[in-house]
Amino acid sequence: LNIPKGRMVLLVGGSGAGKTTFINAITGFEKADAKILLDGKDVYKSFEDVKYDIGFVPQMDMIRYNDNVRKTVLDAASLRLPISISDKEKNEIVDGVLDEFGLKAVEDNMVGKLSGGQKKRESIAMEFVSNPSLFILDEPDSGLDGVLARELMEHLHRISREGKIVIVITHSPDRVLDLFDDVIVLAKDADRTGRLVFYGLVEEAKAFFDRDRMEEIVKVINQKEEGGLGMADELIVKYGEIRNGRK
């Protein structure tokens, strides 16, 4: 895969398709039998140099509920920013991030008192302090209603337009599909091994799978015992032939 900067990418696949393994591989948490390059640097060989250029927000909020908003983001900045940065610079960066995510007005509030949407933005802000070029989010819209979910995804879309790669896993992709540039589709083959079924533009994915909705695409590739159509293997072959220049 070659993902250009400035793209917002949807990652979809059924349960056990390899989404978590894929994310762990590109973030350097697990070493895959592959070369992962970020800005020309090998993630595995130069992990200490690139680890803070990768932002990862897990599905569960990894935040301290018994501390205030600013202190939580400031502590994240202390971990993610170079030690050469002064306290003054660090506080200026935190101010900018709090503004960016609409948290400045509640910076003195306890995190536990925030709304669900604010907690999501707090989690994202903690990773954003190091201004990563690769931003990965696992179900950032989980637990949010349609309006709040769209507002959050629109914000992530704007972040991608700043020249960053934003990769998002969501179980409700169709309500925000227009915000994504590309889609990565993973599926289990007959041996129950996670495989790449498709990577490309959203509209190309619709044509490839002959489906208009991502939820329908996942059903196509899921195994029959999981309520799917069990077409993963033939589509894996089809995509491989396309990548190799054969019809």
Please identify what each model-predicted range represents.
Residues T27:
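Helix-to-loop junction immediately C-terminal to a conserved catalytic motif
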Residues M60, Y65-P82:
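Q-loop/switch helix immediately C-terminal to the Walker
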Residues A34-Y44, V50:
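Conserved ABC transporter NBD signature motif
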Residues E89-V106:
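Conserved ABC ATPase "signature" region
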Residues L1, G14, L38, I93, ...:
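Topological signature of polytopic alpha-helical transporters
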Residues E127-F128:
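ABC ATPase C-loop
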Residues M110-L114:
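Conserved ABC ATPase signature
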Residues F135-E139:
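Catalytic Walker B motif of ABC-type/P-loop ATPase nucleotide-binding domains
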